[in-house]
Amino acid sequence: MSRIGKQPIAIPAGVEVKLEGNLLKFKKGNLAKELDTKANVNVEIKDNNILFSPKGEDRQSRAYWGTYRALAYNIVVGLTQGFSKTLEINGVGYKAALKGKVLELSLGFSHPINYDIPEGIEIVVDKNTIAVKGSDKQVVGQVAAQIREFRPPEPYKGKGVKYSDERIIRKAGKTSKK
């Protein structure tokens, strides 16, 4: 029995949810998202709640049950509150600047790195902090991971791009022989 799958999702005010076959359509204002559920998961909209249940008792149906409930919940939260990830840049001369729909990063390379911001993502740069915001949890995490990947934090001095809540395990440097 899926503990996540059996919990109903309350539909907040202002969010429209329609079920067309296996396709769940979410809409709030001008934001619209779709979730294509597999044929082995039942979806019902009852009493302003979205209910999920497995069609069969096979392993795959039970696995998809909790997965699709979590995906639908993330869409509802994304439409109402949004998601954000915060990155910090540490290092001498390391900086970030926003130029239109391009994030320009100076991370100690011989050239600046230009990162094209995907559609539906908002990036706010404040000194050495980059905030990635959007309504799709997967895309926000992916963009933050791609920015971090340009210069991951190194364990000796901690220079690089890291998540704000990430803890870097530091290493001791070399000791001289006597």
UniProtKB/Swiss-Prot annotation:
<comment type="subunit">
    <text>Part of the 50S ribosomal subunit.</text>
</comment>
<dbReference type="InterPro" id="IPR002358">
    <property type="entry name" value="Ribosomal_uL6_CS"/>
</dbReference>
<dbReference type="InterPro" id="IPR019906">
    <property type="entry name" value="Ribosomal_uL6_bac-type"/>
</dbReference>
<keyword id="KW-0694">RNA-binding</keyword>
<dbReference type="GO" id="GO:0002181">
    <property type="term" value="P:cytoplasmic translation"/>
</dbReference>
<dbReference type="GO" id="GO:0019843">
    <property type="term" value="F:rRNA binding"/>
</dbReference>
<comment type="function">
    <text>This protein binds to the 23S rRNA, and is important in its secondary structure. It is located near the subunit interface in the base of the L7/L12 stalk, and near the tRNA binding site of the peptidyltransferase center.</text>
</comment>
<dbReference type="Pfam" id="PF00347">
    <property type="entry name" value="Ribosomal_L6"/>
</dbReference>
<protein>
    <recommendedName>
        <fullName>Large ribosomal subunit protein uL6</fullName>
    </recommendedName>
</protein>
<dbReference type="InterPro" id="IPR020040">
    <property type="entry name" value="Ribosomal_uL6_a/b-dom"/>
</dbReference>
<dbReference type="GO" id="GO:0003735">
    <property type="term" value="F:structural constituent of ribosome"/>
</dbReference>
<comment type="similarity">
    <text>Belongs to the universal ribosomal protein uL6 family.</text>
</comment>
<keyword id="KW-0687">Ribonucleoprotein</keyword>
<keyword id="KW-0689">Ribosomal protein</keyword>
<dbReference type="InterPro" id="IPR000702">
    <property type="entry name" value="Ribosomal_uL6-like"/>
</dbReference>
<dbReference type="GO" id="GO:0022625">
    <property type="term" value="C:cytosolic large ribosomal subunit"/>
</dbReference>
<dbReference type="InterPro" id="IPR036789">
    <property type="entry name" value="Ribosomal_uL6-like_a/b-dom_sf"/>
</dbReference>
<keyword id="KW-0699">rRNA-binding</keyword>
